[in-house]
Swiss-Prot record:
Record Pfam families: SDH_alpha
UniProt record similarity statement: Belongs to the UPF0597 family.
Name of this protein: UPF0597 protein CBO2008/CLC_1955
GO terms of biological process kind: L-cysteine catabolic process to pyruvate
Any one GO molecular function term: L-cysteine desulfhydrase activity
Length: 434
């Protein structure tokens, strides 16, 4: 990184955050399946008679139990069928935008007639979908890898029709530059970057606030947000910023996991992570009446820290990235928003890691709202504790000598220690499929 100027590093970080912070409708794992099928169909000359889906186990775990937008059904096979029927690859993460009851009935008929098959595969990228579409004359294979709309290759009748040019496109290795930064570096970029470049941050804040508002009104998912709000109105839980963050984040997740059509701004490629980064920071900003510019920078910082952590833990992994990586991003943003310096920001992160490390991912589903709500609340509390000089000591348990050491420890635990645990969880959560 020494060969790059501060301005170049700042621009690369901004580019990374923009690339990983985009609106989406629905959980991004079913989206990835529908998008892959929709892309493959674009290369078909005639009717699709058969769809064979192969997905990574992580895609399977995180996509099998979430409700497809504008439906009351779950399943990656249904997602694939809808991708063929009404999916438009030009819509990207909005591929489910056109779903309605008529299309859903057609998709159910495809499943009933065994038009769609689904099988998990091992030893591949965590984000991987291969869709083989067969017609009377054509056979198209579309392969998605590394990102929820990242089509790597399309093969038509045995010949490559499209192959991504990785020479002119940043790959995972290029994006790993963020691991060479320190938290202090990221904080400095956050403070120095031109505010005009952060307009997209406000779009995400407004989008996710609206999703939380809709989640409180509609009976979607677990209805945790509205249930917590009722408890608050009855005086059984408080009205402090930590509780408000818990309620709103839960409500947004209720909507997303329950098939709501409201777009949600993602973080690190995940809508739930977008909710968990943005909403707690915004709640605290409203509570302390922070200026708009400071809120924008705090949320940008939160997105950056979330992506920083995920470069160690992986895009999809054995731990709950929504609660841990996004929660760490949120608490960092809150600590900075409150005026914390590097000591307090890093202390807030350490408090979160000492608290929530070990929360496993058992797949995306309605109950994710519980984990998100816990993380949102703890992100607020951890930041306030750090600003009151309550910080877990170094070199205790998962906590290393520095915050960067600790995040590296988290990555080691996730990739080396939890690898078998993830296989066991997959066998439990997906036993009817595997």
């Amino acid at each position: 990184m020494s060969r790059l100027s501060k301005e170049e590093i700042s621009e690369r970080l901004l580019e990374l955050i923009k690339d990983e912070t985009k609106p989406a409708i629905g959980c991004t794992e079913p989206v990835a399946v529908a998008f892959t099928v929709a892309t493959g169909k674009k290369y078909m000359a005639g009717e699709v008679l058969k769809i064979d889906l192969k997905v990574s186990k992580n895609i399977l775990k995180n996509g099998k139990s979430v409700t497809i937008p504008n439906t009351e059904v779950c399943g990656l096979d249904i997602a694939g069928a809808l991708g063929e029927i009404c999916g438009d690859p030009e819509e990207g993460l909005f591929v489910f935008r056109n779903v309605n009851n008529e299309y859903l009935d057609k998709a159910k008929e495809m499943i009933k007639n065994k038009v769609v098959t689904l099988n998990p595969i091992e030893n591949t990228d965590p984000v991987f979908v291969e869709a083989t579409l067969k017609g009377e004359q054509d056979e198209v294979i579309a392969i998605l890898k590394g990102g929820h709309t990242n089509i790597e290759k399309v093969i038509v009748n045995g010949k490559i029709a499209f192959e991504k040019d990785n020479k002119n496109k940043k790959d995972n290795k290029d994006c790993d530059f963020i691991k060479e930064l320190s938290l202090k570096d990221i904080r400095q970029i956050t403070e120095d970057i031109s505010i005009e470049k952060l307009d997209f941050i406000m779009d995400g804040i407004e989008m996710n606030k609206e999703a939380a508002k809709e989640g409180l009104k509609r009976q979607k998912g677990l209805t945790l947000g509205s249930s917590l709000l009722k408890l608050q109105e009855e005086g059984k839980i408080g009205k402090d910023s930590a509780t408000i963050a818990r309620i709103l984040t839960a409500a947004g997740s209720d909507l997303r996991m329950g098939g709501g059509m409201c777009p949600i701004m993602t973080s690190g490629g995940s809508g739930n992570q977008g909710l968990c980064v943005i909403l707690p920071i915004n709640v605290v900003a409203e509570d302390i009446k922070a200026p708009k510019e400071r809120l924008q920078r705090a949320v940008f910082f939160g997105h950056a820290v979330n992506n920083f952590v995920k470069k160690y833990t992986g895009k999809l992994s054995a731990i709950c990235g929504c609660a841990i990586a996004a929660g760490i991003g949120a608490t960092a943003g809150i600590a900075w928003l409150l005026g914390g310096k590097d000591k307090e920001i890093e202390g807030a992160i350490l408090n979160m890691l000492a608290n929530l490390t070990g929360m496993v991912c058992d797949g995306a589903k309605g109950s994710c709202a519980i984990k998100l709500s816990t993380s949102a609340s703890e992100a607020v509390i951890s930041a306030y504790l750090a600003l009151n000089d309550i910080i877990v000591p170094n070199n205790t348990g998962i906590i290393g000598n520095t915050v960067e050491d600790t995040i590296n420890n988290l990555g080691m635990l996730c990739k080396d220690g939890f690898y078998k645990a993830d296989d066991v969880m997959l066998s439990i959560a997906c036993k009817e499929v595997i």
